[in-house]
Amino acid sequence: MFITFEGGEGSGKTTLIEKLKHTLLEKKYDVLTTREPGGSKVAEKIRSVLLDNKNTEITAHTEALLFAASRAQHLDEVIIPNLDKVILCDRYIDSSYAYQAFGRNLGMEFVQSINSYALKYLPDLTFYIDLDPKTGIDRVKKNRLHKTDRLDMEVQTFHQKVREGYIRISEMFKERIVVIDGNQSIDAIYQIIMDNILKRL
């Protein structure tokens, strides 16, 4: 089962994935955790270019293409060979929709066209953790273990457009996207997600 987790900066995805992995392993499921951009050696190198806050000259189209390239490598190396497992993936195609199609105003048609390969492997289930961008960025700033990246440094209006994009996407693909209020405690969000996963496994 291929499960993805989406949300703006500071939405708690990484923490939740670790908690879910621990529980699913205890229940004897074969679990793989991974992330985008990244997840494999080559894809992680692309990630470092994308998120390096010194690379301010990256254009919107280049950014979108790099995300798509990282995703293709990740699919071939990690996702497709492990589709018989429970895959918990931190971000996937919906991040490109929210950040590039809406946040960068590139539009859904362009983003879908460069991600046509990934569209053949859509998640079985996606959890979108909805959170006000200011709350999320404040959380990121308070987390000293988090290194501020290029996307964290974007202005508030960009992050607001990303959130609006996620809401639109959730309406477009409601058959696979579960929207969760990110203002709840991590434990409450975890329980909602776990209940949804166990219903489908």
UniProtKB/Swiss-Prot annotation:
Binding positions (ATP): 7-14
Keywords: ATP-binding, Kinase, Nucleotide biosynthesis, Nucleotide-binding, Transferase
Membrane spanning residue stretches: none
Reactions this protein catalyses: dTMP + ATP = dTDP + ADP
One GO CC annotation: cytosol
Gene Ontology molecular function, alphabetical: ATP binding; dTMP kinase activity
Entry annotated with the keyword Kinase: yes
InterPro entries xrefs: P-loop_NTPase (IPR027417), Thymidylate_kin-like_dom (IPR039430), Thymidylate_kin_CS (IPR018095), Thymidylate_kinase (IPR018094)
E.C. no: 2.7.4.9
Uppermost EC category: transferase
One family name in Pfam for this protein: Thymidylate_kin
Taxonomy, superkingdom: Bacteria
A biological process from GO: dTDP biosynthetic process
Signal peptide: none
Family label: Belongs to the thymidylate kinase family.
Protein purpose: Phosphorylation of dTMP to form dTDP in both de novo and salvage pathways of dTTP synthesis.
UniProt cross-references to PANTHER family, sorted A to Z: THYMIDYLATE KINASE (PTHR10344), UMP-CMP KINASE 2, MITOCHONDRIAL (PTHR10344:SF4)
Name of the protein in question: Thymidylate kinase
Taxonomic source organism: Acholeplasma laidlawii (strain PG-8A)
